[in-house]
Amino acid sequence: CHGYKGFKDWGAWNLVAEAFANGNFFFIKFNFSHNGGTADQPIDFPDLEAFGNNNYTKELDDLESVLNWISINSEFKKEVNLNDISLLGHSRAGGIVLLKANEDKRIKRVITLAGVCDFSKRSSTIGDLQAWKRNGVKYVVNGRTKQKMPHYIQFYEDFIQNQERLNIQKATENLQIPHLIIHGDKDTSVLMNEAENLKKWNQNSVYKIIKGANHVFNVAHPWNKETLSKEMDEVVSTSLSFFKRLISSFIKKNKIWDCVDRN
């Protein structure tokens, strides 16, 4: 799952997907429904109105829809072990996959990449509340595209209404499945202390620090190279080793699905 201001084809995610597929995993990547992309233009943010109406519970519901879609799609029956599903989330989606893993018994293991530990402390959740409530919207400038990206007050209201469900600490403490935490020691977007909190809340988790890695493990968008950065390659190899130690049977190799592109 992609993070805040992200999308499934950002940077080197396609190379990451290929690496998992080549490792004999059926790998699905998708865009959250309100990430700002469209079916015709899934890269970048042509639909800022949708972006402004996104929230955490919509992302949880989107992930639920993808899990259900996998479960009922007959063409996957011979390829996917529905009793052995793993989730991987980057940044904000690290919190999303932890919450969903705690809710859904179909999930058997989870990996968080530069994952957040507390939605209540993210600037997208709080910020200048008085001005946000007064204006009904606040804007964040995208450093790459230079777009002024709206965040409607519904984002905050939805968080307040669903605080119990959106409690990452509680979900992590209750987690009964294997959890791999991966974080870069040069991450300035989600600091190392957030990874340390996740480890503290789940002492059974596996904790891997990638030396010299920033928030996106030293890849960027666009990524025109044919190979991953050294740091992202370490993320992939660590993740594959984690999965393969835990999974007793593998599904059909070389399968990647962009499910947002399919009806």
Please annotate each region the language model reported:
Residues 174-176, 181-183, 187:
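Short beta-strand/loop motif that positions the catalytic acidic residue
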Residues 13, 177, 190-200, 222:
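Short alpha-helix in the alpha/beta-hydrolase fold that links the catalytic acid
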Residues 186-190, 215:
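Acidic catalytic loop of the alpha/beta-hydrolase fold
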Residues 1-36:
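Short, surface-exposed "cap/lid" segments of acyl-processing enzymes
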Residues 76-90:
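Alpha/beta-hydrolase fold nucleophile elbow
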Residues 213-263:
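Catalytic active-site module of serine/aspartate enzymes centered on a nucleophile-bearing elbow/loop
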Residues 103-154:
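Hydrolase active-site cap/lid region
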Residues 49-78:
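Alpha/beta-hydrolase active-site loop
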